[in-house]
Amino acid sequence: MKLFEPGRIGRMLIKNRLVMAPMHVGGLIEPDGRLLQRCIDYYTARARGGVGLIISTPHSIRGEIKSYKMWMTGLSELSDAVHDYGVKVAVQLSAGQGRNVSTDYLRSVGAVGPSTLPCYFNPDLMTRELRIEEIQRLVQSFQFAAEVVSSAGIDAIELNCHYGYLADEFLTELWNKRTDRYGGDLEGRLRFPLEIIQAIKRGAGAEFPLSFRFGLTHYLEGGRSTEEGLLIARKVEAAGVHAIHVDAGCYETEYWGIPTVYLKPGCLVGLSEMVKKVVNIPVITVGKLGNPELAERVILEGKADFIALGRTLLADPEWPHKAKEGKFEDIRPCIGCENCLGRMRESKYISCAVNPMTGMEREFTVRQAKRARSILVVGGGPGGMEAARIAALRGHKVTLWEKGDALGGNLIPASVPEFKQEYRSLIKYLSVQIEKLGVNIELAKEATVEQIQAMNPDVVFIATGSMPIIPDLPGIEKGNVVAAIDLLLGKREAGQSVIVIGGGLVGCETALYLTQKGKKLTVVETLNDILRDTFRINRTHLQELLADAGIQVFTSTKVLEITDDGIIIADKYSEKKIKADTVVLAVGSKSDKNLSETLNGQIPHVYEVGDCLEPGKVINAIWDGFRKARLV
């Protein structure tokens, strides 16, 4: 595969075309930029997995050279650890977040920008415009930081100039309203990034490999156009950068910068292809490229020189080795749930819903058990399959009973819409792994207490999942009412006009799915907003898709009754009737505790796993199965 041929960025020879994209690591790094041992372990795992170049978490530039000298020890240890695997490492340097700082940071420290701008998370608060002498000190600080980075054995630097952060704000007319030499036309707006590039070269050396990360377009009215983006690409090439790392978006359109499940794989490749046509230096592309065949095709067709993988490598650090060996079925897929981001926004360390070891590589090592036991797992959903996988890895003799005719549990209906194809990949991955590990899988087998007692296992994991909640409403028994799960599984068909009761993720994705099948949709939610429990980026994108599809959404609205031809609803002002052929229920789920309650006290060493314990997300089920099986 061409994906595994060497490539160059400036003088730096990289063993393949795979780059670990820069991602914030949350609690794995100190606020002053020092790397914790867990951070080094995290990057080492990706180096061991076979990536060619690792680009670090962004390091914010502030203060004098003594501030950056504190980075030296951690960066030196990182470079040594990564180099042991023949992998190169770059440090991304950032001028800061500008108007995109968190509200807490904004209130305690404040925010600066090229101009006075409303802050993204709290538009009532404004950034302070940087003075020219502050800009010049900031530029000088990049030189200091580059000196430290290059002295620590790091192989390259990447300049963060994307996503609407401070350097990108200077570059963008929408946010840069200055009238001095750092504003105005493109030449003025480029001055700050170009001065940073020269400062990095003074600090690290003119030939020290330097990548420029920027968004070719913001996909935002008034933001950067692709035409201007191509001009910028040519100008930074002329300034001496050695590679251009192309993405898109900003906080207003962040589902482009961190592509959601609703965008197609390789959604940003067309942008890198445009840049390739106007520059003569390597171009790095990024964005939902976790399919090895797609990544290979991008390189073969000359649409980019390098493939950057971000969340893909959180899900499976061994992706490069598995792809090179053609073991595609062994690649654990990113499902695009964005819990990795959600947890960091809660001030936690970087993590992954489908890979509990991410960020805890040393602490969560799976070791052989001291004594092999017989283990029964009841339920073949994500929690049950993960428990079976880990138990088998530890050397236990594992049997899994699933009452249905296929593995997957609630992932099966969740994976029906085309935009949830990653969930199908997760089912396949888990199924293949437990089969390869020798788990005895019995389908169409509903467990009873008597059967479990007859088997007499040492340990039982109950992973029977959850079932839909059926609300107590007048008319709930009518023939036009169907649970979302039954509709997705094809047990029932929807009419041409459909009302979905419930504006959570299941309800809204079901509505989008039905709209794509040509149905007319209405969503009714009792809370004051839909998708309350969905992380911001997926939520924002899905809300826009629902609006674009013409789906009518009622919030702060109760359903009073289901009729033969629709429902009667009420808000605080009035009641009204909405007509529809079909009423879909998506008001949540409840744990299926029938077996666990029956087993209570009759069999020792019984553990509930996943939704059986408490309904939750994929992350809850998989992490629960992982942690409990790891301790048995």
Feature names for model-found ranges:
Residues 1-378, 382, 386, 390-393, ...:
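Flavin-dependent oxidoreductase catalytic cores
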Residues 28-29, 64, 167, 220, ...:
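Glycine/Thr-rich phosphate-binding loops of Rossmann-like dinucleotide-binding domains
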Residues 289, 381-383, 406, 504-506, ...:
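Residue-level detector of alpha-helix initiation sites
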Residues 377-393, 495-521:
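Rossmann-like NAD(P)H-binding beta-loop-alpha module
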Residues 396-412, 519-531:
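Glycine-rich FAD pyrophosphate-binding loop
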Residues 424-469, 476-496, 516-598, 602:
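A Rossmann-like FAD-binding core segment of flavoenzymes
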Residues 510, 529-539, 609-632:
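A conserved FAD-binding loop/helix module that cradles the flavin
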